[in-house]
Amino acid sequence: MAAADALPTSSASASASADGPRTGNPSTDRAIAMLLALVREGVTDVVLCPGSRSQALALVAAELERVDGVRLHVRIDERAAGFLALGLGVESGRPAPVITTSGTAVANLHPAVLEGWHSGVPMLLLTGDRPAELRGIASNQTTRQPGMFGDRVACIDVPAPEETDDDLARDALLARDAYRRARDERTPVHVNVAFRDPLSVAVPDLTEAVAEVRAAAPATPAPAGPATADVLDLPHGPRTLVVAGHAAGEAAEELARAGGWPLAAEISSGSHFGPNLVVSFRELLAREGFGDRVERVIVFGHPTLTREVPLLVGREDVEAIVVGSTGGEDYDPRHRVTAHPAAVRVVGEPADPAEARRWLGTWVHESRAILDEATAAESAPLLPSGTTPAERRDFARAELAAVRADVTRRHLVRALWQATWPHDRLVLGASRLIREADRALPGKRVRVHANRGLAGIDGTISTGLGIALASQAGSGSAAAGITRVLVGDLTLLHDVGSLLIGTGERVPRIQVIVGNDGGGTIFDGLEVSRTAAPASIDRVMFTPQRVDLASLARAYGWAHLRAATHGELEAALTTASEAPLLIEVPLAR
């Protein structure tokens, strides 16, 4: 959609009139009107980066924090701020406005905006800008900001303010409409706000204004369900596999249970649990009698972690149904999807109940056998404690050897899974480790997030911080939980600036666990590793790094633990720390 007509410009109305005291300064009064409108809509968190052109918004946000109107999160790096807002939106389901000044500050939001658009996360960008007369004439720190994020991100360019009631009411309505669109459509929305000198004055006390807008706040609407006409009825007939990709939610597990069908659920799907779960679906899709017998596949979410799923969806002999959408594009590998309903439901009964039970049972049984075999290969042999001195000595030696064993990737993800409870949050970076987790971890109802919209390593730590801040701010069980972020060393270094949490900022309970294998070993498993020269692979793909992570953590005010053995890892994951904790786990390449 075009930037100019992306959002409506509603006329003033009593239901969204400009509230709060006036200062006589158009910039400050605009900021008060817009941010109070957002508080009225239910905004609880605001992220901002310092800057001159956006100072009115920043100073009003600071006053709102002072009077407990919002929780304010200040960052000096706009890329980190964007992903922090993304994490807040992931956890809460509501956009957390992110405020920046003009120029490259806006451009640095782009990675988070792309991830938000592709993964269906609500975001609201409030970017300061020069007035029209200062654009296009090489003014300092001025570029073409409207439309910077492309024609897929809704954008409105708000002209510099005048001091009239109609203008302030319009500003409040624009803020309201932008917020609602981001929330309801689960997408980024960009409001580019021009300010003219003088850029701010002292902000008045907003205590009464916050109380008034909260008293008048509308109830948050319940998510609208799909129209009856867009619900597809599914008969039991064909041999069916349910696939839950990233952000599928619990609907995939519910459908698999209702239909009596096997469930192939990726680790960040939100459906990686339940009696129908098939963890080892990759192996079975390639095995005779399993993948070749699938007649229908029903996909929820965005599958990104396997090649087997898109191959299955693209087969001519398989009916492919993709339910809903988790981002700006519909999942349709090889353009073979036959239906794309908003929702589905199971109708009727199986024609052959015994055959239906066998179909599900063989998938679940074989998957568990594969998983048990892999677990046994990684685990220490089970020995009886013994009654004789020799038997007790052998048992003690075996126990000690298990504790002292080096950590492997599979053991790392299993130990992390075992330490994580339903009230905790787990964030997985884009590396070999998320694939290891996807292949090795049994079902468990744990909230797992990964930035799989574009599957980049950008902003993983900052996303995790946003999820931690949002989950621990509420009154539910998650408020007592901890957020663990599992990344590779390159993912950590790419987002290292996010470790900087400024003085006076909220510090959540968080552990960043770094699988440190000295570079990008994910490329060792790709085709390029079999065709390119090893020296070239190391130079331009593996990109070896040597960083003292203990010193790095200390520089940013994080605690640091090194966990090279099973025993050290178990102790580290259960360590209580006042400071955020970075756990370094050395891994072999």
Swiss-Prot record:
GO molecular function: 2-succinyl-5-enolpyruvyl-6-hydroxy-3-cyclohexene-1-carboxylic-acid synthase activity; magnesium ion binding; manganese ion binding; thiamine pyrophosphate binding
GO biological process, one term: menaquinone biosynthetic process
InterPro entries: MenaQ_synth_MenD, THDP-binding, Thiamin_PyroP_enz_TPP-bd_dom, TPP_enzyme_TPP-bd
Spans annotated as Disordered: 1-26
Keyword Metal-binding: yes
Keywords for the protein's UniProt record, in alphabetical order: Magnesium, Manganese, Menaquinone biosynthesis, Metal-binding, Thiamine pyrophosphate, Transferase
Reaction(s) catalysed by this chain's protein: isochorismate + 2-oxoglutarate + H(+) = 5-enolpyruvoyl-6-hydroxy-2-succinyl-cyclohex-3-ene-1-carboxylate + CO2
Chain intervals with Low complexity compositional bias: 1-18
EC number: 2.2.1.9
SUPFAM superfamilies reported for this sequence: Thiamin diphosphate-binding fold (THDP-binding) (SSF52518)
Descriptive protein name: 2-succinyl-5-enolpyruvyl-6-hydroxy-3-cyclohexene-1-carboxylate synthase
Organism: Clavibacter sepedonicus
Gene name of this polypeptide: menD
